[in-house]
Amino acid sequence: MLCYRVAVQNSPLYFPVDFKFKENAEIFRNYLSKRDGRTDYYIIEIFYEIGLPDYKDEEVLLLLSQNQ
């Protein structure tokens, strides 16, 4: 199964939130960039060979909409 995550460029750091849709990961990346004043966040693709991703699209988008 494929999922998307937000990561930090030139760093092993990433946010452990699995997104089913790349568009939702981009919304989260844009939020983090504005919040932190950083431009080095990007989207990575993760492929689960064993197990399933724990998709958090709805939960994260709901939290972001409440924080605006």
Locate the predicted segments by residue:
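Conserved aromatic
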Residues: 18-22
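Short, mixed-charge low-complexity intrinsically disordered segments
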Residues: 14, 31-68
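Short aromatic-glycine-(Arg/Gly/Cys) micro-motifs in beta-strand/loop hairpins
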Residues: 1-15, 41-44
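Short amphipathic alpha-helices within nucleic acid-binding modules
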Residues: 25-28
